[in-house]
Each structure stands twice: as structure tokens, then as C-alpha cells.
């Protein structure tokens, strides 16, 4: 896992160049949003159980067939596994928010997910929907906290990255 600064430095080191204005602007943006990213992650961390519970409740109210016999969350064990996965996506999203970089999502969440879900016959649409719902819940929680988030993309980028990558996969 690398943060924004490490990625920039590695890129310039590999080419043997000094940091240019573009690199300095990216680093400045990263540093200027550091406190906001920390505040967002602090809210997510303190509300994680609520976020997961609400995301699951909304997803299952939209797709009740998942809880019926034959559904992918029908047994207690399968339901618990679904909640575990939702927590997993949320936790790694917070890592990406802090890092200001989505690479960890590729390394630890998205790579290999297609094969795993295919082997378990897990449909991807409910997963994508749960990630969308979590993003909505977090935006609502942030607005309740009256935080002055200058860049809404701080919250959206990791969730949108997961949604886009999962939606592109033919599962």
C-alpha cells in the first residue's frame, strides 16, 4: 500500500527527474486535505457498526430475495459472511481515504474478487449496491456533522473506484 506522496516520488524517481509543478500541486492538494481525510475516517470509524447495519438493512429491503431460501444470504452463516464483506469494503475504503490513493483497493479487495465470487456463485449486483448505500450513508453522516469538506471526492473516490471496477467485471 502506498500513499499519494510515495506514488508521486516513486514515479519521478523511476524517471530520474526532479518534481515538477504538477507533482508539487498533487502533493500540496494531498497535504491540504489531510485533516479532512482524517476527520472523514474518524467519523466512519466511530459510526462503522451503524453504517454496516444500515447498508445491510437497506440492501435487504431492496432485494429481499437474498434472504429467502436459495438466496445468497439465506442462512445465518451466509448472512454473517455478507456483513463481514460489507465491513471489509468499508474498512479498506478508509485506508484508501487516508492514503489518498486507491491502489490498496486493487491490491487487497478487487484483485481476485471475480474468481472468488464466481467460485462461490455470489452475485455482484448486491455487493455493488451495498457499496453505493455505504457511500450515501457516509455523505449523510458527514453532512450531519456539519464538516466543511472542500473535496467531496475524498469520500467518493474509493467507493466509486470499487463500484466501477466491480461493475466492469463479468461475474
From Swiss-Prot:
Keyword Repeat: no
Species the sequence originates in: Aglaothamnion neglectum (Red alga)
Main location: plastid
UniProt-recorded name of the protein: Allophycocyanin subunit beta-18
Membrane topology: Peripheral membrane protein
Biological process, per Gene Ontology: photosynthesis
Compartment(s) where it occurs, according to its Swiss-Prot or TrEMBL record: Plastid, Chloroplast thylakoid membrane
Swiss-Prot/TrEMBL keywords: Antenna complex, Bile pigment, Chloroplast, Chromophore, Electron transport, Membrane, Methylation, Photosynthesis, Phycobilisome, Plastid, Thylakoid, Transport
Record bears the keyword Electron transport: yes
Assembly and binders: Heterodimer of an alpha and a beta chain.
Family matches, as SUPFAM superfamilies: Globin-like
CDD domains associated with the record: APC_beta
Annotated positions binding (2R,3E)-phycocyanobilin: 82
PTMs per UniProt: Contains one covalently linked bilin chromophore.
Purpose of the protein: Light-harvesting photosynthetic bile pigment-protein from the phycobiliprotein complex. Allophycocyanin has a maximum absorption at approximately 650 nanometers.
Pfam families the UniProt entry points to: Phycobilisome
Family: Belongs to the phycobiliprotein family.
Modified residues (N4-methylasparagine): 72
One annotated Gene Ontology cellular component of this protein: chloroplast thylakoid membrane
Amino acid at each position: 500500500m502506498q500513499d499519494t506522496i510515495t506514488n508521486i516520488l516513486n514515479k519521478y524517481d523511476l524517471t530520474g527527474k526532479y518534481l515538477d509543478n504538477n507533482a508539487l500541486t498533487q502533493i500540496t492538494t494531498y497535504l491540504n486535505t489531510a485533516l479532512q481525510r482524517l476527520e472523514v475516517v474518524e467519523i466512519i470509524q466511530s459510526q462503522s457498526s451503524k453504517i454496516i447495519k444500515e447498508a445491510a438493512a437497506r440492501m435487504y429491503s431492496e432485494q429481499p430475495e437474498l434472504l429467502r431460501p436459495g438466496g445468497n444470504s439465506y442462512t445465518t452463516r451466509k448472512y454473517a459472511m455478507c456483513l463481514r464483506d460489507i465491513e471489509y469494503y468499508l474498512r479498506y475504503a478508509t485506508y484508501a481515504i487516508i492514503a489518498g490513493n486507491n491502489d490498496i483497493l486493487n491490491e487487497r479487495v478487487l484483485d481476485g474478487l471475480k474468481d472468488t465470487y464466481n467460485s462461490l456463485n455470489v452475485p455482484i449486483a448486491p455487493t455493488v449496491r451495498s457499496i453505493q448505500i455505504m457511500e450515501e450513508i457516509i455523505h449523510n453522516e458527514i453532512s450531519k456533522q456539519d464538516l466543511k469538506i472542500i473535496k467531496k471526492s475524498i469520500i467518493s473516490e474509493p467507493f466509486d473506484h470499487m463500484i466501477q471496477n466491480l461493475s466492469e467485471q463479468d461475474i
